[in-house]
Amino acid sequence: MIARAVIGVLGLLAAIVLAACGGDGAGGEPFDLTLDFYVNPDHAGIYTALDRGYFADAGLDLNPQVPSDPSAPIKQVAAGRADLAISYEPEVVLARDQGLDVVAVAALVNGPLTSLISLPEADIASASDLAGKTVVTAGIPYQAAYLDTILGRAGVDPETVDQVDVGFNLMPPVISGRADAMFGGFLNVEGVDLAERGLDPRVVPVDELGVPTYDELVLVADADRVAEDPEPIREFLVALERGTDAAARDPQAATDALVEAGDGLDPELTRAEVDATLPRLVPPGDMPYGWMDPERWQRFADYLYEAGQIESTADAADLLTNDLLPRAREQSG
């Protein structure tokens, strides 16, 4: 997953067991969903739909699985070991570049969550203030490209910034003062956590710092599966839209569903994270639920190519399809 606070091995194993126990159990068609990481507020629509039986209504026995390796979801789908996976737009572009025949079928979070996060005492009012600072990162190559873009736009020599890879454990160095900022934390997770601690974080998503905007989280399927057996995926998306609508109407119920499914989630913090997340789970304007903008995807894929993150140019038409979205079906039928 992209830059989240790390959890221990035992906690992750427990989360795997708990998430795996989330199936509707109504005798529907088995449907395996590989999550991006442990249960978190980005999954509010999923677990609300699961709690209310919407997947069962759609004829699906949903089995959400927490991956043992956060890089595994797309590989699970490509290998036929999952029906859908939650991943990230840049990961889809990278996977296609590496020859994996996968396609994004819906946006789960249609805007960047990845952010530059600092505390007031670091005195970072803008990216130009990063010169001479220590920034902890998750060590993800394309996020390093983001940071290079941001520094270049701000006129900062990357050599003047001490970038330290700490994996997903981004918060402790910032809280302790050993680092001036974190890059890669999510505005609705680390940003909210720091705010709930009363630390008044400055949180700036990457698209406000010069990185082309993109869909942070997407649902990914095997391209052959989409062509040959799309109906279960369509029904999943119908149920997920219902769950997301229900979560937006009743954030406390969404919080309760997440806390019940997750391992050791703090109810108050989870509610704050859910409140920060829900507005980002619905598309802008009148776009269908899950809509992905092909032109925006093309710009982002071109950016990754120009940044040296992929070897060949990518065509957005190969990266995504909006054909399985609920209202896309209504409009075509």
Language-model features and meaning:
Residues 1-10:
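Bacterial N-terminal signal peptides that target proteins for export
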Residues 17-20:
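C-terminal motif of bacterial Sec signal peptides marking the signal peptidase cleavage site
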Residues 27-167, 171-188, 203-205:
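Short, glycine-/small- and polar/acidic-enriched structural segments
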Residues 227-307:
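Secondary-structure end/capping motifs
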